[in-house]
Structure formats: structure tokens, C-alpha cells
């Protein structure tokens, strides 16, 4: 019934239901609404409002947002946000096709990752990727370290600084480039906020313009979770890990002889 009420507000109509004392037998033209366009297919119906009820729609959206803020259940919150998107005209359907079930699942996961990244970007914005943002953050650690009086805390600050500079070196090394050289070149251009290394093209350029970006929320959460895991290791009395297996030496090639 909530969806029907949303449609009624969008079109300026009235929901026909017993609670309002209206039945189909008693319904008149007054309960009908108007729409600029209605598209009906086998699987979906799309209703486009004509703008007459914009004020009522905004009030309805505000009401649903308040409900979503008070709801703790993720499923219910997702459905409420879906209603907000539909009333606001922000609904998109992504259809994914594939030749095999395995390929379909893999594509579906990629689309979900892209959607989650987009949602995160909308929430907190974006920063340049390629490990360059973390490298720039590492330069802020020294000023924080100066405010610390505990030597152990200062040691922790040094560890975080080294860790923040590691991703860009790893990305460069995986691309077949000297990670230390790449890191130093980015640091030499620290005054250019979007300057960085594009591993895909092996070039130094404006990463924001090149589309090499990360959602700010993803970068922040990754750093927070990494620090949390490290803290757990430091506080644990014992850490159990698998014993690394030694690589077996290749058997010597059988030598040929004269017969």
C-alpha cells in the first residue's frame, strides 16, 4: 500500500481502499490522477509525473527519509531508499547478460562492486588513486608525531608513515617499474594535488583528469581497518599462523651418457 500511496501523490490521485471509505463501486473520476507519460511492459511499469504535484512529492520524500533514518533493519532501509529514488526520479536498471552461469556471476559481482564504489563516492567524494593519496597523507604524519609525548606512540606514527607509502611502491613494482623512483617523483611534485603515477599507461599525469580515482570512504575505511587489525595483533598474547612450506628444489636433469 505504501507504493500505491507514492503513486497517488506523484499523480495527484487517491488510493482506493476500504480504510478511506472508498471502494471500486463508489470510485469516481475524482480519484484519478494525471501523468505526463506511462510506459507499461511485460516486466515493469514506469510513471512520469507532470510536475503539478512536485511540492507534495518533496514532502513525501522528506517523510520517507525520516523513516529511513529511524529504521535499524538494513532490508527495510534499502526498500525505503528505493522508494525515495523512485519518487526523486533517480532509478536505473542495469541488465547484465552472459553466455554462461559462471560468467554471469562474475559480471554481477563486478557491477555490484561498481555500484558500491559509486555509492561510497556520492557519500564522501573521491580522491586520486594509485596509492598517491595515501603517499600524500604520509607527509602529514610528522606534524602529528610532534604532538606525541610517548615514545611508543611515536614509533607507531613511524610505522603508519611507512605503511602509507607502501601501496604506490607495490603498484609500481607490479607494473614493472621501480617503486622507489616512482614514489620519489610523486613526492617531488607534491605541490600538484592531482599529480601521480598511472600504472595502466606507465605515465605520470593528472590522475583526476585520467580517471584514476578512489572513493574517499573506501580509502578511509581501508586505513582504519588496517590500523584496527594491527592493533589487534599488538594486543594479542599469541598469534597462530600456518607454517610456510619450503619450496622444493627442482630435480636435477638426467644427464646423457655414451653407450
UniProtKB/Swiss-Prot annotation:
It comes from Chlamydomonas reinhardtii. This protein binds RuBisCO small and large subunits and is implicated in the assembly of the enzyme oligomer. One of its GO terms (cellular component) is chloroplast. It comes from the Eukaryota. Oligomer of probably six alpha and six beta subunits. Keywords: ATP-binding, Chaperone, Chloroplast, Nucleotide-binding, Plastid, Stress response. Transmembrane segments: none annotated. Its main location: plastid. This protein shows ATPase activity. PROSITE patterns: CHAPERONINS_CPN60 (PS00296). GO terms for biological process: protein refolding. Disulfide bonds: none annotated. It is found in: Plastid, Chloroplast. InterPro entries: Chaperonin_Cpn60_CS, Cpn60/GroEL, Cpn60/GroEL/TCP-1, GroEL-like_apical_dom_sf, GROEL-like_equatorial_sf, TCP-1-like_intermed_sf. Induction: By heat shock. Coiled coil: none annotated. This is RuBisCO large subunit-binding protein subunit beta-2. Belongs to the chaperonin (HSP60) family. One of its GO terms (molecular function) is ATP-dependent protein folding chaperone.
